[in-house]
Amino acid sequence: MQKKNAKKYAGLRDEQFSLVEHYARQHGINSKFLLVFTWIYNNPEGITQEFICKRTYSSKQVIQSIVKNHMRKGWLYLETIPNDKRRKLIRMTELGRKEIASLVEPLNIYEAKAFSALTKEQQKAFLEATQIFTETFKELIESYRVDD
């Protein structure tokens, strides 16, 4: 039964990932860009490249490419951290905030509407179960090592 339920959940999660990818593609980007933009948007005071790499399991090169590309578009800029000149915060310009908001905010609204289809009790149970599942899944994935 557990294996069957795990497979069913994986299918539902995959459908959610595919829906987000579809949404991103409609805006001319992919879900990795959308994920990075979401982190930047939700941290308007600035966020480091290292933090985004850690939270999205992305390489520095991937994040750096996204940031540099969107610096050229005038969406992002880098700000030196006063007490650590080597590290920089990624911040949005006014144009960037407007453009990124047009990507992130509709998705936030859709997620909130989908969540509101659940009762308060279902929401609480869903959040608790998802938190336990995510923490356990993370531990298992992060402990996995490929033999060389």
Show where each model-derived region lies:
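N-terminal leader segment of winged-helix/HTH proteins
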Residues: M1-H27
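N-terminal positioning helix adjacent to the helix-turn-helix/winged-helix DNA-binding module
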Residues: N5, L12, K32-F33, T48, ...
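Hydrophobic recognition helices of helix-based DNA-binding modules
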Residues: Q16, V20, G74, I100-L103, ...
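N-terminal helix-turn-helix DNA-binding core of bacterial DNA-binding proteins
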Residues: S18-V62
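Charged, amphipathic alpha-helical coiled-coil/dimerization segments
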Residues: N69-E128
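C-terminal regulatory/oligomerization modules of transcriptional regulators
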Residues: E121-D148
